[in-house]
A protein has these predicted regions:
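Immediate post-signal-peptide N-terminus of mature secreted/exported proteins
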Residues: 21-77, 172-179
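Extracytoplasmic electrostatic interaction patches
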Residues: 101-179
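Short, solvent-exposed, charged loop/turn and helix-capping segments
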Residues: 85-108
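Amphipathic alpha-helix face/heptad-repeat signature
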Residues: 29-41, 72-79, 102-112, 148-151, ...
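Short amphipathic alpha-helical segments at helix-loop
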Residues: 68-71, 94, 140, 144
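Amphipathic, well-ordered alpha-helical segments in soluble domains
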Residues: 51, 79-89, 116-120
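Secondary-structure edge/capping motif, primarily at the C-terminal ends of alpha-helices
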Residues: 50-67, 90-97, 120-135, 166
C-alpha cells in the first residue's frame, strides 16, 4: 500500500511539474506580445522606402565570406516569415484574464500588417528590383501611409499602453525610448 501511494504521489508531482513548465511567465507573455513588435517597426510607406533603399547582404551560396545584396523581394519575404512566426507564437500563448487584451491587441496588430507586407510591400519591392522610378516608389509609399499608417499607429499605441503597466507590475525592465 505504501509503495502504491508513493508511486501515485511521484506521478502526480511529475505531472504537476510538466504542466507548470507549459505555463508562460509574465516575461514570456510580454516578450512575445509586446517586445517582438520590434520586428514590425517602423511600419509604413516612408519606413519601407528607407529599409528597402539600402538592402541587407547575404552570403553567396557555396562561399563562407562572399556577400551579395539581397533583392528587395527577399527582404520583404524575410519580413513576412518573421511576422508569421511571431504571430504563431502569440496565438499559442494560453489565454489569461490578465494578458487577454494585450495578447489580442498584438494579434490584431500582426494580422493588420501581414496583408500589407504581402501586398503593397511586395509591390514596392518589385518596383525597386525591376527598376521602377523614384516617383513610382514614392507614390506607392504614400499610398501605404494613406491606407494603413493610422490603423497601424492606433493598434501599436494601444499595445504599448497595455504593455507598460504590465511590465511595471511584473518588474520587467524595458527601455521604452520615448514611447
Amino acid at each position: 500500500m505504501n509503495h502504491r501511494f508513493r508511486s501515485a504521489f511521484i506521478a502526480f508531482a511529475v505531472g504537476l511539474l510538466l504542466t507548470s513548465c507549459n505555463n508562460p511567465t509574465p516575461k514570456n507573455y510580454f516578450d512575445e506580445a509586446v517586445l517582438n513588435v520590434n520586428l514590425i517597426t517602423p511600419f509604413g510607406g516612408q519606413a519601407a522606402l528607407q529599409s528597402l533603399a539600402h538592402p541587407s547582404v547575404k552570403l553567396v551560396p557555396g562561399t563562407k565570406d562572399q556577400t551579395a545584396p539581397m533583392t528587395r523581394e527577399e527582404i520583404v519575404e524575410d519580413q513576412i516569415q518573421r511576422v508569421e512566426g511571431s504571430l504563431t507564437k502569440i496565438k499559442a500563448l494560453p489565454d489569461s484574464e490578465e494578458t487577454r487584451d494585450m495578447v489580442q491587441t498584438s494579434i490584431k496588430l500582426h494580422e493588420f500588417v501581414l496583408p500589407v507586407y504581402k501586398g503593397e510591400y511586395r509591390e514596392l519591392a518589385k518596383l525597386y528590383d525591376e527598376g521602377g522610378s523614384q516617383q513610382e516608389r514614392v507614390a506607392k509609399a504614400q499610398e501605404i501611409d494613406r491606407k494603413y499608417l493610422a490603423g497601424y499607429q492606433a493598434l501599436f499605441n494601444r499595445l504599448i499602453e497595455l504593455g507598460k503597466p504590465y511590465a511595471a507590475k511584473h518588474n520587467i525592465k524595458v527601455e521604452w525610448n520615448g514611447l
